[in-house]
C-alpha cells in the first residue's frame, strides 16, 4: 500500500478529467459507526487573498453533475470574477486569509464513494462535516397565541 493521494483512476469509475483551467480535489470520508444519512458535508470553495490590501468578496456556485450510466455524483465549482474595494495599507507584511463563497452547499455523507470536486486553479476547497444532535420536538402554537393582521379597505 502506498501513501500517495488517490487519483480518479483508483475508483474505477469514468470521472471526467479536469479541464485545462481546473484542478480536481478528492475527499475520502471516514465510515461512521451510526447512520450516515444523518450527516452532511458542506463544501466551502473560496480564494486565499491578501488581508488588509483590499476588502474582497468572492461569489460562485457549486453545481452537481452525475456520471451517466453510473449514478455517481461529482461537483463543479464555478467562480465569478473577484470584486474588491481597495484600502490603503502601510505595512509591508500582508497576511493572507481564506475568503469563502457565501453560499452553503450541503451534500449527502457517503463513505463508500469519494467526493470529487472540480474547481478553478485559483480556488481552494475546504469542507466541514455536520453531525447530528438530538432531535427537538416543536409544539404547535395555539391560534390565540398568534398575532392577527388586520386588513384595511383602501
Curated annotation (Swiss-Prot):
GO molecular function, one term: serine-type endopeptidase inhibitor activity
GO biological process, one term: symbiont-mediated suppression of host complement activation
GO cellular component: paraflagellar rod
Matches recorded under InterPro entries: Ecotin_C (IPR027438), Ecotin_sf (IPR036198), Prot_inh_ecotin (IPR005658)
Similarity section: Belongs to the protease inhibitor I11 (ecotin) family.
PANTHER family: ECOTIN (PTHR35890:SF3), PTHR35890
Protein's UniProt name: Ecotin-like protein 2
Lineage of source species: Eukaryota, Discoba, Euglenozoa, Kinetoplastea, Metakinetoplastina
